[in-house]
UniProtKB/Swiss-Prot annotation:
HAMAP family: HisE, HisI, HisIE. GO terms for molecular function: ATP binding; phosphoribosyl-AMP cyclohydrolase activity; phosphoribosyl-ATP diphosphatase activity. The gene is hisI. This is Histidine biosynthesis bifunctional protein HisIE. Residues 1-123 are annotated as: Phosphoribosyl-AMP cyclohydrolase. Its EC number is 3.5.4.19, 3.6.1.31. Keywords: Amino-acid biosynthesis, ATP-binding, Cytoplasm, Histidine biosynthesis, Hydrolase, Multifunctional enzyme, Nucleotide-binding. SUPFAM superfamilies: all-alpha NTP pyrophosphatases (SSF101386), HisI-like (SSF141734).
């Protein structure tokens, strides 16, 4: 069936153009609860990779765009009221930002599992490599590739917007979340200018002397 006809089956009007999406792996384990607007579902259908709509950021992102933990979509189901979706996916890596396989990894009332802090900063190097690949070999539906396509003005604007998000964040968890976004957009800005993270590290070492 044509993509546009599939999109028409969803009741977008009920929740202001956004529908909840339950995500399961092929064994039936629930991985996360996400959201889609029409464009996110379109990108998912076109690419076969899960794209979700961030209500807090007001934008679409491919799952795993930054982490590499993409979700290949095997099947999409719709509920009886046509206002919720179920994605059956093959995940590459954990679904949760905490590093857990599923976002539903604890019972109600259980304390949060705190992951050990990694001070190696190796994740920044890994992220830099992913961003470089998106620049050199654009991927359809990739947020990073889209930034490079739109060019300098868009990249610098997004970096500025993310810096403001850090400044206005009040809660500890929100500050961590926004700083992570800021670091990602900083790496995009550096990569756009063909500046490596290593060069910045060398400058910091020089200043320490």
């Amino acid at each position: 069936m044509e993509i546009e006809k599939l999109l028409e089956q969803v009741n977008w009007e009920k929740n202001n153009g956004i529908v909840p999406v339950i995500v399961q792996d092929e064994k039936g384990e629930v991985l996360t609860l996400a959201y889609m607007n029409k464009e996110a579902l379109r990108k998912t259908l076109e690419t076969g990779i899960a794209h979700y709509y961030s209500r807090s950021k007001g934008r679409i992102r491919m799952k795993g765009e930054v982490s590499g933990n993409i979700q290949t979509v095997k099947e999409i189901k719709i509920d009886c009221d046509n206002d919720a979706l179920l994605l059956i996916v093959s995940p590459k890596g954990p679904a949760c930002h905490t590093g857990n396989y599923s976002c539903f990894y604890r019972k109600l009332g259980e304390p949060e599992r705190v992951l050990p802090i990694d001070y190696s900063l190796s994740i920044l190097k890994e992220l830099e490599e992913i961003i470089k690949r998106r620049k050199e070999t654009p991927v359809e539906g990739s947020y990073t590739s889209k930034l490079f396509k739109e060019g300098r003005e868009k990249i610098y604007k997004k970096f500025g917007e993310e810096a403001i998000e850090v400044l206005v964040a009040e809660k500890r968890e929100r500050i961590i979340y926004e700083v992570a976004d800021l670091l990602y957009h900083l790496l995009v800005l550096l990569t756009y200018n063909d500046i490596s993270l290593g060069e910045v590290m060398n400058e910091l070492r020089r200043r320490r002397k």
